[in-house]
Amino acid sequence: MKLTRILFIAAMFFVASAAAGWAQLHAASDGPVAYGHHHVNGTDLAAHKRFWANTLGGIPTAFGQSEMYKFPNVHVFVREREPTGGTKGSTVNHIGFRVPSVRATLGKVRAAGFPVVTRQELPPGVAVIDDMAYIDNQDTYIAFVMAPDNVKVELVEARDQEEAIALHHIHFDTNNVDAMKAWYVDTFGAIPGTRGSFQAADLPGVNLTYSGNPASLEGTEGRSLDHIGFEVENLEAFCRQLESAGVEFDVPYRELDQLGIAIAFFTDPFGTYIELTEGLDKY
């Protein structure tokens, strides 16, 4: 199983190297740990292509029966595998992208036939007009849409943004906000803070947002968002540091020499499956 995963990663990175440079992991040069990728399990690759490429504008790169979609500061990998559930109910409730106009992006989402779920995903006290909500404490408009296989996606308006779309945040659900936030701050060096009313922490390229949820939450592995990925400088030493802190790796550090890539996998204490990479920023 582990060998299959490694061969799969090798194949997808090889093909990805041909993609255009517009959607690279530019933030990877801004610190020793930056965000790298989302990895999705999907039942219909054509539907995922319509969402990630045709609708949101990611740059598609084919590798066998799978796809990768490149956005500024995040690559979205889609593997053909039936997920055990969507993002809701797992430790990663949704992923967020920033766009210059939420209204314009929603028009594309509707035209492509994907669900817009803003009203369903916000508390009754938050006003939703034309499927958009103005969030006063963030001074911006947001909306929620559903990608195939119930991957929940938030759109956050950034009016002055030059790119058509870029990574914005990962929104975690947890039974213990303080503990989860502290773990990501201590482990990855994220800068603690807030985002509006939410507890949060920042890494180059991404905001990590935390919400309390008293429900029983499942880990991400096997679900539609299988794992999240961080790009790490000097990954081998970083893995040794994590091991000394008690982290047990599902896939220990190893190098894929032919690609100049190194990888490792582990699960955080709250159930989120994480891949660490070094070299993904070159693709």
Language model segments and positions:
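Generic "edge-of-domain/loop-turn" microfeature
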Residues: 45-47, 76, 83, 102-104, ...
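Bacterial N-terminal signal peptides
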Residues: 7-18
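Core segments of cupin and vicinal oxygen chelate
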Residues: 30, 36-76, 81, 104, ...
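Short, flexible, solvent-exposed loop/turn segments with mixed acidic/basic and small polar residues
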Residues: 27-29, 82-87, 159-161, 215-219
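Positively charged n-region of N-terminal signal peptides that target proteins for export
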Residues: 1-5
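Vicinal oxygen chelate
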Residues: 22-30, 33-43, 68, 85-172, 194-196, 200, ...
